[in-house]
A protein has these predicted regions:
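Bacterial N-terminal signal peptides that target proteins for export
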Residues: 1-10
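Bacterial N-terminal signal peptides
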Residues: 9-18
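Exposed, flexible binding/inhibitory loops of compact, secreted disulfide-stabilized domains
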Residues: 20-127
Length: 127
């Protein structure tokens, strides 16, 4: 009877450790997915090619735990595949939110100020 209790206790501990490892692994995969999407979005957002600021666009980039974008990204609408970029930005927001929830990430809930678009030296900039 005592050996059955020890075996059961060992099994429960192993199960709990395995579950924790799976959660950590899952969170790691969520973070990797978010990082990949962020890299892809940055690669898609081409700030060059516009001739005036009116051709530049701006969007939120990523997700803060309290909500809203963690930063903003600017690009030239003439040289950027806007539809693909917006889809990637939406996927990035969802991926970061899922990762943040999985790890219980908290934030100071500070507002990320929306920058103004600028056209400097032939490039769209968020300042």
């Amino acid at each position: 009877m005592a050996s059955q209790a020890i075996q059961l206790g060992t099994w429960v501990v192993a199960l709990l450790m395995g579950a924790g490892g799976a959660d950590g692994e899952s969170a790691s995969k969520l973070k990797q997915r978010a990082d990949t999407l962020a890299s892809e979005a940055r690669a898609l957002a081409n700030p060059s090619g516009c001739e005036k600021v009116e051709e530049c666009e701006l969007a939120g980039f990523g997700h803060k735990p309290c909500g809203g974008p963690r930063e903003y990204i600017a690009w030239c609408s003439r040289t950027t595949d806007v539809k693909t970029l917006r889809a990637r930005l939406e996927a990035l927001e969802k991926a970061e939110k899922a990762w943040q929830e999985a790890v219980g990430l908290k934030s100071n809930c500070g507002l990320t100020r929306k920058p103004r678009l600028r056209w400097e030296a032939g490039q769209c900039r968020a300042r």
